[in-house]
Amino acid sequence: FMNIVTYATPGAFLADNQAYLRDHEVEAQLNLGNAVAHREEPCGPELLFGKVEEQGRAVLLFGYLVPWNLCLDDVAHSDSGVQAARELALWLKAQEIVVPGVNGRQVLCEAFLQVWGSAYELRIAMDAMVLRRLHAPLPKGGALRLAVPEDEEVAAPWIAAFQQEAGHRELPLEMAREKFQKRVEKGTLYLFETRAGTPVFMATVSRFLPHGKCISGVYTEPGSRGQGYCQEAMALLCQRLMGQGDEYVALFVDKTNPVSNRAYQKIGFEIVEDNCDYRLKEGT
């Protein structure tokens, strides 16, 4: 028998599941990050955190924040987690809570979607990776630095291009400029320059976790790809973050980009879990 438990606040979710979340920060980072950001807000249909229990033991954690996907965390890593995903789909339908999609391990997402019954598509299949010990490549003489307002004409088009390459909806340049400006204000956007001072790479520190940080928006200018800049830049960024006290650096990578993924592995990143992003098709 499975039982679904929901929480009054994201903070209560964090407290009740702290042991799992502490030991699996990288795998659970989407729910963990959202719960921390909205810790004291009251939960409801548009901000929902819970767990599915089997015989009093959590086998699946879930979180939903409008307008984002439902996120599933596989506590059990067994058939119990798969069955819990099915039970959760039935429960959400009974509560008339409609989600735009689901993120999590492929086996969980597919079990959920089969019960949900609507048409869906796989937007991207990813691996969650983590680096705890850096293997620095031989330096090429480039330099990593924080982006400054004067970089907007270079970096804003890159942000728009990254969105398109990653399969997201097209991002108008003006919106890309806004994203650039916010990241510069927060001090989260980094650029890598060649020895000649030419920017060729960018990455964003996008999620601050209790013991580490997550990097996203990794982009190398097309004309500079295949020359080792990404590998060196990522090594420098990880070195900087871990030098500031982080125990690890996390990253989601596209399964269909093995060249980049090998570059990450060469500097010490390891795959910890698969993560798929499924979207429900509108009108189904």
Placement of each model-derived feature along the sequence:
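Short amphipathic alpha-helix that is part of the acyltransferase structural core
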Residues: 1-30, 134-169
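Conserved donor-binding loop and adjoining core beta-sheet/short helix segment
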Residues: 2-8, 21, 25, 33-95, ...
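Acetyl-CoA-dependent GNAT
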Residues: 63-68, 163, 167-168, 174-216
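Acyl-donor-binding surface of acyltransferase catalytic domains
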Residues: 66-141, 278
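Conserved acetyl-CoA-binding loop-helix of GNAT-fold acetyltransferases
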Residues: 80-91, 216-222, 226-243, 261-266
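Conserved GNAT acetyl-CoA-binding A-motif
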Residues: 96-105, 241-253
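Conserved beta-strand-loop-alpha-helix junction that forms the acyl-donor binding cleft
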Residues: 103-109, 251-261, 278-283
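Conserved acetyl-CoA-binding loop of GNAT-fold acetyltransferases
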Residues: 117-123, 265-274
